[in-house]
Amino acid sequence: MDPKISEMHPALRLVDPQIQLAVTRMENAVGRDQNNVGPKVYPIILRLGSPLSLNMARKTLNSLEDKAFQLTPIAVQMTKLATTEELPDEFVVVTVK
């Protein structure tokens, strides 16, 4: 695993086994998917207690695969108010298993 990406923090509860989460700074995540082989990066601003969906992600979709993946809900909720250290820049990297 990339040392720039931390393990999923307890502040996030991941329900869907088909999706993995990693917390990282956006500048570390951008560029990892340039050849469409790496993880798909979706910057998401987290809201306490709110389920997130990829429809909330701000990403330019340039392939049908991305469009299909965007419609898949991310079963993630904030379980507590996270600090900046726990969720740097409030961005999450979402990848498909």
UniProtKB/Swiss-Prot annotation:
Residue ranges of the motif Nuclear export signal: 45-53
Outcome when changing S53E: Complete loss of binding to host TOMM70
Molecular-function GO term, any one: protein sequestering activity
Keyword field: Host cytoplasm, Host mitochondrion, Host-virus interaction, Inhibition of host innate immune response by virus, Inhibition of host MAVS by virus, Inhibition of host RLR pathway by virus, Viral immunoevasion
Keyword Ribosomal protein carried by entry: no
CDD domains for the chain: SARS-CoV_ORF9b
Chief location: host cell
Domain 9b positions: 8-97
Pfam families in UniProt: bCoV_lipid_BD
Places the protein is found: Host cytoplasm; Host mitochondrion
GO BP terms in the entry: negative regulation of defense response to virus; negative regulation of mitochondrial fission; positive regulation of autophagosome assembly; symbiont-mediated suppression of host cytoplasmic pattern recognition receptor signaling pathway via inhibition of MAVS activity; symbiont-mediated suppression of host type I interferon-mediated signaling pathway
A single Gene Ontology CC term: host cell mitochondrion
Family: Belongs to the coronavirus group 2 protein 9b family.
Self-association and partners: Homodimer. Interacts with host TOMM70; the interaction occurs only with monomer.
Other observations noted: The open reading frame (ORF) encoding for this protein overlaps with the N ORF.
Protein function: Plays a role in inhibiting the host innate immune response by targeting the mitochondrial-associated innate immune response. Acts by binding to host TOMM70, inhibiting its binding to HSP90AB1 thereby disrupting the interferon activation pathway.
Name of the protein in its database record: ORF9b protein
The species this protein was found in: Severe acute respiratory syndrome coronavirus 2
